[in-house]
Amino acid sequence: MYDIPAVPTFPDNETQLRVETSALRRRMLEGSWGPDLERYLQSQIDLSRRATWGTIDQSSNVFAHSCKALAVLYSEKPLVGVPREFREQAEPYLQHDGALDRSNFFSIMQSVQYKTIGIREMFLRVDVSDSKELLFRPVTPDMVYASAPAGDPLKPNVIYEYRLRQNMQTKKMFWTADVYDLRDEDNPKYQVQKVDMDGTFTEDLSDIFLGGNMDGANYPYRDSQGKAFLPWVVYHASMTGKLFNPYELSSVVSGSLQASCYYCFLKHLFLDSAWPQRYVSNLQLAGLSTYGTGEQTQRMSISADPSSILCFVPDPDNQSQPMIGQFEAGLKDPNQMISAITVYERRLSSMMGIDPASVTKVSSDPRSGYSIAMSQASTRDAQRRFSEVFRVGDVQSIVLGAKISNRFLGTNYPEEPVYNIQYVAVPMSPEELKAQREDIIQKMEKGLIGHVEAIQDLYDLTEEEAVEKLRTIRQQRIEFGT
């Protein structure tokens, strides 16, 4: 069993704050946010109360559920093409079971889009795998330092990636930084540096992990013209003109933690106060046990459930008549509380850009829990919303894949940004198709559109393709008499 050291801090406060923000979101998206919810609960309520609540309830995570609902761009594998003059050169790269297909690039992009929407940025490291295939490795921003020149703020020229490595002799794990630096284009750098806990570089380990010095003329990542490049692609959820936009949707993140806090309290009520409790007065409760002796949360209590009767003994200091009765249940109307939490969750999802009216309800009961399952029309809207910004990153990734394959695998793929990506939209439902047909027919009857425009709208074709389809339909009617 290995001892994994804590992740080192980054050298400046601005980067460290960004990293901590991104790390919380990553944990919420990956499902490892239990300790974060526990800390949030303890900041909301007194420790003595927290001790009675039991385990946390992580069933509600509006932030992650909303990101998952919006990440639909790669639900179907996109189509990639090139101009005719590049077709023969690009065919081994883009064809079925070609180099890009074997790398599982678009399958990986499903996870990349999911995390990009939540964290607002994602990094993709393009490399060659041990099996001599292209490798697209997603890296979350909380493990990366990057900066870009003021004149080109979306194109980084220096990137550090924190990576955990092992000393094969001592078997100890330690943190390193893979450094890619193009600030001096005449002297590009690729290094592996050992990182101290305060983020300072203490030792150059390039000879051990890279096999030698990779600076200057030895820099390995160059295109067919010999120009150095960074083997990285930065994906953005929205183009803001900045390299990082880490604090957008912060209200949704904190609100999701708050909603989970409400569900933890609801669980506590269900388990501990969903029944009327019997009691007596002027007597002492027998069988009390002390918990947390000597701690801040020390308390005396006894287990009870709906079938229990609490036993008391006479109070020697009180001669009054004992009384027997019961308290009303603390949770008298769970539906009212669930409805209030559901309204709160809907407001959070609307802040993510999900229209509550477009969400498909799992149950017709308005008190039912909130489930984010968008309609097909809203899913297509989400695809259109993200298609342009992700197309920029996808083209860069495919171009980088071609450059690295040419450099290290001896291929000859096009290195120019000539790749065209067509994302496959979610098909219309039968109801939507019927409404579309009726709308097109009405417009044609009113003389608002012609036959070519109608075919374009119905089948999503270009004008030339629509004309050709109309000719085919006319020929078939003549031939078959229909």
Regions found by a protein language model. Give the residues of each.
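Extended, charged amphipathic alpha-helical segments
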Residues: G212-A373, V424, M428
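Surface-exposed loop-to-helix/strand elements on domain peripheries
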Residues: R84, Q89-L94, V313-A435, L470-I473, ...
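Residue-level preference for well-ordered alpha-helical positions
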Residues: A71, S349, A402-N406, Q442-K446, ...
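Extended, regular secondary-structure scaffolds
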Residues: S111-G118, F123-N245
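Amphipathic alpha-helical protein-protein interaction segments
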Residues: R120-D127, P334, K443, E453-D457
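Charged substrate- and nucleic-acid-binding regions of tRNA-handling and nucleotidyl-transfer enzymes
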Residues: E431-G481
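Short coil/turn segments at secondary-structure boundaries
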Residues: V112, V126-S129, D272-Y279, S358-S364, ...
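Extended, helix-rich architectural segments
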Residues: M1-V158
